[in-house]
């Protein structure tokens, strides 16, 4: 098994790094436990800008329409940021300036507004963020999936236009399309939603996967043409086609890759799940998942490279691990961090992977 070394380590955060994300260009975004976001230039490997996006932990980040950055925080906010790189100078933030900015604590937002006129809030939606489940976004289906506002065991689907409407008042709740999506009673008690993933298949169907506290992985399907239907009865749009208790501990991450669905949990399993090919598929018609016992408990995050050939997991033991998507065979161990890894990301279209850790560092690696 290959044991590579990182080609660069980014140091700029003063608290645990909870989310990391590449855009399609030369930037890497990282978010931390204190709510700060740093935009790193991958050419110079230095921070281009930083601001306090949230007052609490950042749960997740996504690049949405027009290259805007959407961040989800535990302060119950889903915020879309407009970043005008054309107005930025060629100067970079020094690490001392970055540390000074982060030392402002709760008042840092006012300081970042003074120093970052090229960063502005485009939309600000009030959501449920009391769990650790980040939002999911699908550019093809143009929907956003979040935990239900009141019930942690249910999901709500929002129109992604909510992310682009200019902020008109403080308490914007977005446009909800379907609400209270949950497994059928036959599945039993599932507990809180821990992770979600959304994809479009065959340009006809939208697949929604959810991993639950009980260890269940559940998949729902709807037609692409009906996904924007506004209804109080989610069953008029979504159909549950798959439910399997694939983990003995809570599911920590689910991720679609083409026609495959992968999941990891607090146990030591990676699971490859079958996916429905049609809305005509019924519950129980799909085969059982394929399991790989890794002997490493607590795989916090899973991501698949854009070529769908390899996947990587973020481990509580401070290791990133690389596996084959086809066989789930282990390929490499990414060993550098002194504490658990919270998040990871593949650069789109390249062999670079970023690992974000509780030790406040971000390591960059090149894989084959």
Swiss-Prot record:
Ranges occupied by WD repeats: 12-50, 53-91, 246-283, 294-333, 336-368
Pfam families: WD40 (PF00400)
SMART domains the record matches: WD40
Alphabetical keyword list: Chromatin regulator, Cytoplasm, Nucleus, Repeat, WD repeat
InterPro entries assigned: WD40/YVTN_repeat-like_dom_sf (IPR015943), WD40_repeat_dom_sf (IPR036322), WD40_rpt (IPR001680)
An example Gene Ontology CC term for this record: TTT Hsp90 cochaperone complex
Biological processes annotated in GO: 'de novo' cotranslational protein folding; chromatin organization
Subcellular location: Cytoplasm; Nucleus
Subunit structure: Component of the ASTRA chromatin-remodeling machinery complex.
Entry function: Component of the ASTRA complex probably involved in chromatin remodeling.
Family according to the record: Belongs to the WD repeat ASA1 family.
Name of the protein in its database record: ASTRA-associated protein 1
